[in-house]
Amino acid sequence: MIPEEITIREFNRNDAKDIVKLHSESSENFEEEEITEDFILNIANRNDFRLFVITLRGKVIGFIGVLFHINVGRAEIGPICIRSIYRGRGIGTRLLYHAMEFLRQRGIRRVIVRIKSENTRALMFFKKNGFIEEGYFREYTRRGEDVIQLRRFIWECCV
């Protein structure tokens, strides 16, 4: 059940500290072991990247990033993170669909996500939301972890 006080909006620089904290709470799911506020501010300033936050009563409880290439109609989802106590309530799905709608409005037709193979919760989340496996990359990360690539075509999205 999604609380009514939920809001999704574009990232602003005041959110950087909250994103760093959220990342540190789930760092085992990310390729980067540690990130800084400067790192977040740098990627958020890219023209081909958008970061959205989801808030509950004004407090950041999750975020999603999208890297998009309008000229070729492709995008990549990631990172995505929801504070652990709010998982399983549809909040991540709402955030994902917000990002997918953003991409659809920009003419993106193909979206991928890459997930560490042992992150079964994320794999189930994306499969539940219509993504299908299309590739397996052995020792893909700096630490030698395997990664699974999933994809979804944007017109399949019920945004």
Q: PLM features: what roles do these ranges have?
A:
Residues 59, 83-97, 106, 117-124, ...:
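Conserved glycine-rich acetyl-CoA-binding loop
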Residues 104-114:
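Conserved GNAT acetyl-CoA-binding A-motif
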Residues 39, 119-120, 142-143:
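Short secondary-structure capping/turn micro-motifs that flank functional sites
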Residues 114-115, 132-148:
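Conserved catalytic-core motifs of GNAT/GCN5-like acyltransferases
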Residues 68, 115-117:
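A cross-domain feature marking catalytic cores of carbohydrate-active enzymes
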Residues 10-14, 20-79, 83-85, 96-98, ...:
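Acetyl-CoA-dependent GNAT
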Residues 1-2, 152-158:
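Acyl-donor-binding surface of acyltransferase catalytic domains
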